[in-house]
Amino acid sequence: MKGKEADTIKSLKQFFTAERPDAYTLEDLRNILRILRSDEGCPWDRKQTFETMVPCVLEEAGEVTEAVRNQDTENLCEELGDLLFQVVFYCQMAEEQGLFAFEDAVDGISRKMVRRHPKIFGGDLPETDGNEGDLWERIKRAEKAKNHKTT
């Protein structure tokens, strides 16, 4: 770890304590992950890869599904947090490899939601008969076809 990065990690660590009275934020979670993946962090977290984290993502997604099916809203909140952690973890690994940043993932999904909801976000589409799911699928197929042509 470079000197400046090590100093940043040390300075960040002081903000994270079990007794912290303030609520944590998404940026806090991202910083916690940076610390966990740093040289001063957790050996298990440091050695994880995209591939080794797949079972964790699947497990957490399954636990979200189970909480929904059981109408267990208290557990749902916790399980959604666990699933969010997986997303942030993947983005942190991607950023470390110079692939993309968390902000890129947020930008990508935001743009996709706007594109796939043209009736809501000012697209030039006629009113539909309530089959917005069909519209979503048509737009999705068109996007995939366009992406396959450009790759």
Language-model segment annotations:
Residues 1-79, 85-151:
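Flexible "arm" and connector segments at domain edges
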